[in-house]
UniProtKB/Swiss-Prot annotation:
The keyword Cell cycle applies. It is found in: Cytoplasm. This is Cell division protein ZapD. SUPFAM superfamilies: YacF-like. One of its GO terms (biological process) is division septum assembly. One of its GO terms (cellular component) is cell division site. Disulfide bonds: none annotated. It comes from Paraburkholderia phytofirmans (strain DSM 17436 / LMG 22146 / PsJN) (Burkholderia phytofirmans). The gene is zapD. Pfam families: ZapD (PF07072). Belongs to the ZapD family. Cell division factor that enhances FtsZ-ring assembly. Directly interacts with FtsZ and promotes bundling of FtsZ protofilaments, with a reduction in FtsZ GTPase activity.
Length: 251
């Protein structure tokens, strides 16, 4: 099944973006070629932009603290697997400690590094990081891959508490949902939300159907409409019934 996810609010949208960026960053950082490490570095700049939202850190701390207070009373409950509960609570408490130790504006350490700032300003220009534009960057790209990885890992370290917090919040949200099998009649589906507040919607479709869900929602109702791509990859509305799995997630 192919999984599509749709955030219902700006906070979850930001966390999904962070998750995607960190996954890309990790993939390219583990590679060997200097061009792959260039992608890792430019992705780090993107992470800094997204993570630099003024209230992100405080939002994450509030949510983790709320989850900690929700889960802590289950300690000693015979109906709850205690080892799993303690693992989650320990993870939350460790991440809260990491967030509380973050000082200053998020990503400021990258802005304060003149060398990185010069690369960042050139990277937004198409072809702006050629060797004749940034000879010192080109020289750095010639050093051993392990040293490049070590440098990039050092630059990303101050941002890792945000990554860890995003992972926990998204995991708890995803685990809260229960998948149901539904049918989009003639490619369209709608469902009343009955006043319940959700943060995330998941749509799973069989790959052989080759359909693409487009979703929207408000506090009363959600809509899912399926399209297919024509020869020019442009979306075209589906006019047949489409089976899919729908999961609504709420923290």
């Amino acid at each position: 099944m192919i999984l599509y996810e749709y955030p219902f609010n700006e906070r979850i949208r930001t966390l999904l973006r962070l998750e995607d960026l960190f996954e890309r960053f990790t993939f390219f950082l583990t590679q060997e070629d200097a061009r792959e490490h260039h992608v890792a570095l430019t992705t780090l700049f993107e992470i800094s932009e997204v993570a630099g939202r003024a209230d992100l850190k405080s939002d994450l701390m509030k949510e983790l603290e709320r989850q900690r207070q929700t889960l802590a009373p289950f300690r000693g409950n015979p109906g709850i697997e205690q080892s799993a509960l303690e693992a989650v609570l320990g993870e939350i408490e460790q991440t809260l400690a990491g967030l509380s130790q973050m000082q200053g504006k998020t990503g400021q350490h990258l802005a304060d590094n003149e060398w990185l700032a010069s690369i960042r300003s050139r990277a937004i220009i198409p072809g702006g990081t050629c060797k004749f534009d940034l000879p010192s960057y080109y020289a750095w790209q010639q050093i051993h891959p392990d040293q490049r990885r070590q440098d990039i890992a050092k630059w990303v370290t101050p941002l890792l508490p945000l990554r860890d917090a995003a992972i926990i919040v998204l995991r708890l949200a995803r685990e809260s949902g229960q998948a149901s099998k539904v049918m989009a009649m003639q490619g369209s589906y709608q469902q009343m939300l009955s006043g319940r507040s959700y943060q995330l919607m998941q749509v799973r479709v069989a790959p052989e159907l080759r359909v693409i869900p487009e979703a929207s929602a408000n506090k009363y109702m959600l809509w899912v409409r399926f399209t297919v791509q024509d020869g020019d990859l442009r979306p075209r509305a589906v006019d047949v019934d489409v089976p899919f799995q729908l999961t609504l997630c709420s923290l």
